[in-house]
A protein has these predicted regions:
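Short loop/turn segments at secondary-structure transitions that flank enzyme active sites
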Residues: 170-174, 182, 214, 488-492, ...
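Conserved structured core elements
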Residues: 116-119, 140-143, 158-162, 202-205, ...
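Charged, low-complexity interaction segments
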Residues: 1-67, 184-548, 556, 573, ...
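Subunit-assembly interface segments of extracellular/virion macromolecular structures
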Residues: 119-120, 165-169, 173-178, 183-186, ...
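Elongated scaffolding segments in large macromolecular assemblies
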Residues: 186, 597, 606-679
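Cys/His-rich short segments
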Residues: 101-245, 249-251
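N-terminal alpha-helical interaction blocks
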Residues: 1-144, 148-158, 164, 174, ...
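Generic amphipathic alpha-helical segments used as scaffolds and interaction surfaces in large
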Residues: 109-116, 155, 471, 537-552, ...
Length: 679
């Protein structure tokens, strides 16, 4: 196959193991992470050789591309732990190596995928196409060996893949096996060559070239009605784990809506359906306490620095340099030169900070759930908004990432609150893909209000295990952000610190009812494991009216900011925080809007430069107008929420964003709720 470029960030947020990716020649299934890593290690290609050879620090293989983040490692440990038993192996992350990292040409492949689906369509014959299996030389190399092309002395072409596959909410994926579907009436025909004839509209017919049995798409016994009524047999396949396995497993059945009968979970799905593969990502956003090129060079060797400090209590710059030079390949000449140029007091302070950070992380090695991580992020952001970050006593000659003098307050009579806006000059964003689900069909799973996903999260394909360590694929970016929260206001309104305040409406009552129902489910959830309980805790947070208020406002801010910041909408990220203070019983909340990019320079300040009083005042006024009206009203405004559909008044004309921008799958949005709180 020809090479198809994929960015590392795209691999994490949009594709990953188990995903079908469009290529120049058709469709490719990305294998499990273990297969990808083994290919990098053992394929014998130039990329594989360069991947395995030691770098200037003596590191080889995955260690060369390791991402260090203690918070994410704690989250991954929680994700892998079982009730009462913590995960025992080490957990580490690595980034996807690029062609430049492996010193190969941009057109040379690094990773290989499987051809999927394995049925193709030859389109070289007038009036109809021919459906047949690809002739597979290996898992990664195929041809469409059309017998009719051979008979007519026509050179066979690659053809195109069949545009449908079969998938289910348990994560299974398989080809539509045409011999079974066409000959399902008991016909003993063994032919595997079929005609594809379009007969108008969306309908088409698949007909056996030998016995002339056929099946259509829209008929009373067609593919579509079979899919709706649960009559497509699921064989329980995970082709990203074993592409050769076919019809070897089984899958549980469900009650089919409308019929009340038990049936298959399998559904007919288009290749390009976004719900066919929905990644499960963990995200950690932090304001670095220390940063800079020298920090990034020294941080991976923090254990070495700790040993030097233990040996030399009265450490000076000359002694430190002598010890580092004795380590040979551990440190590059560029690092040594940077150390020599750095003033001694700044250098020793940096080394002490790095070692102190290591000691703190080693002591704080408890598992961390997603909801706990979000609460930690909110606490640190609120503290930064109050005192700046790092606090003034620690800044020295370093620049502050949150400068207290840059924070502004914007009274908003439109929303009835006073916003505090804190520009954050540098953020570190870590994303790790830990699984995926297949969000397809409408089964009884869709009625499960305790989960934002219809499909079951499958995590077996998304890690690689060696003897001592479980590795996950991650992505590390540097960026900037704007944190927005609410402060005490003199505006005469029902808001205050809580944007909902004393407001009351049917919409707010409905959201409160949903929130209370989910809370009751959590209280009685004795059979749930820790990961499932954490997912339910997040659903409770996301259905809180305060969260919905902030999330709806955040989307409107993003849609307006993209016009003025020069940053495309898909490059933005969002974090919505809502945490109940156990001491006071009140809610702390806010939003973080950020943009990040690979490399030490991040996004160069285009976002934080917009934090200016006149601009932000106008921005909130514009957003309030967009909250009140939508070009799709009254259709949009009449959408009402319920327990099984917790999306209120929102549509693509006013609120919905791309999947890569919204961290919450465009759920828990409601313009009506925000309107009910406006003066």
């Amino acid at each position: 196959m020809d090479v198809t470029p994929i960015r590392p960030s795209q691999f994490i947020t949009r594709t990953g193991p188990g995903a079908l990716t469009p290529t120049v020649e058709g469709s490719m299934l990305i294998p499990q992470l273990s297969t990808l890593v083994q290919e990098l290690m053992n394929s014998g290609t130039k990329a594989s050789v360069n991947f395995s050879e030691p770098d200037s620090f003596g590191k080889t293989g995955l260690q060369k591309f390791e991402i260090n983040d203690s918070r994410m490692e704690r989250m991954l440990r929680h994700f892998n732990s079982k009730p009462g038993k913590s995960f025992e192996k080490n957990i580490k992350m690595f980034r996807l190596p690029t062609n430049a990292d492996l010193r190969i040409k941009e057109i040379d492949p690094i990773l290989k995928g499987f051809i999927f689906p394995r049925w193709g369509l030859c389109t070289q014959h007038k009036g109809y196409g021919l459906v047949m299996q690809f002739s597979q030389k290996s898992n990664f190399e195929i041809i469409l060996d059309c017998p009719k092309c051979r008979d007519q002395n026509i050179v066979p072409i690659r053809g195109s893949p069949i545009r449908f596959v079969q998938a289910c909410t348990n994560g299974h994926l398989q080809d539509l096996y045409w011999p079974y579907l066409v000959h399902s009436g008991g016909n003993n025909c063994t032919s595997k060559l079929f005609e594809w004839r379009d007969i108008g509209g969306d309908n088409f017919i698949i007909k056996c070239t030998k016995c002339r049995e056929q099946i259509d798409y829209l008929g009373s016994n067609g593919l579509k009605i079979r899919s709706i009524n649960g009559r497509l047999k699921c064989q329980g396949n995970f082709p990203e784990i074993n592409i050769q396995a076919y019809a070897q497993g089984s899958c549980s059945q469900v009650i089919i809506p409308g019929t009340g009968m038990m049936g298959s979970r399998a559904k007919l799905v288009m290749l390009n359906s976004t719900g066919l593969h929905t990644p499960k990502n963990l995200t950690s956003v932090q304001i670095p306490s220390i940063s800079g090129p020298l920090y990034r060079e020294l941080f991976p060797h923090r254990a070495v620095l700790k040993s030097i400090l233990l040996l030399k209590h009265d450490l000076d710059k000359i002694t430190l340099l002598d010890h580092l030079k004795q380590l040979g390949t551990e440190f590059t000449n560029d690092t040594i030169n940077e150390i020599e140029r750095t003033p001694e007091n700044e250098l020793l302070s940096l080394v002490n900070d790095i070692v102190s950070e290591l000691t703190t992380n080693n002591k704080n090695n408890k598992t961390l759930s997603e909801s706990q991580s979000n609460d930690e992020e909110l606490t640190s952001l609120l503290e930064a908004a109050r005192t700046g970050y790092p606090p003034s006593a620690k800044i020295g000659k370093k620049h502050a990432y949150v400068n207290i003098e840059d924070i502004i307050k914007i009274p908003s009579p439109e929303f009835g609150v006073t916003f505090r806006i804190s520009p954050i000059k540098e953020l570190r964003v870590i994303k790790t893909q830990v699984g995926y689900s297949r969000e397809i069909g409408t089964t009884d799973d869709a009625l499960d209000s305790t989960n934002s996903r219809v499909g079951t999260i499958k995590k077996e394909s998304n890690h690689y295990d060696d003897d001592t360590t479980r590795w996950y694929l991650g992505d590390e970016n540097i960026g900037e952000g704007i944190f927005i929260d609410i402060i005490e206001s003199e505006i005469n309104n029902p808001g205050g610190l809580n944007p909902i305040g004393s407001s009351s409406s049917n919409n707010i009552d409905t959201w409160n009812s949903i929130n209370s129902t989910l809370d009751d489910i959590l209280t009685n959830s004795v059979d749930y494991d820790e990961v499932k309980k954490d997912e339910l805790k997040q659903e409770i947070t996301h259905s809180n009216p305060t969260f919905v208020w902030w999330h709806t406002l955040c989307h409107k801010l993003l849609l307006n900011l993209t016009v003025d910041s020069g940053i495309s909408l898909v490059s933005f990220g969002e974090r919505v925080y809502c945490k109940k203070n156990t001491r006071t019983g009140k809610y702390q909340s806010g939003i973080l809007i950020y943009s990040s990019a690979t490399g030490s320079d991040g996004t160069l300040g285009g976002l934080v430069s917009l934090v200016e009083e006149q601009f932000m005042t106008k921005l909130f006024k514009t957003c309030s107008q967009g909250i009140v009206s939508c070009s799709n009203d009254p259709v949009c405004s009449e959408r009402k929420i319920e327990l099984t559909k917790i999306e209120g008044a929102c549509c693509h004309a006013c609120e919905l964003l791309s999947e890569t921008t919204c961290s919450y799958q465009n759920r828990c949005l409601d313009r009506n709720l925000v309107q009910d709180t406006m003066p």
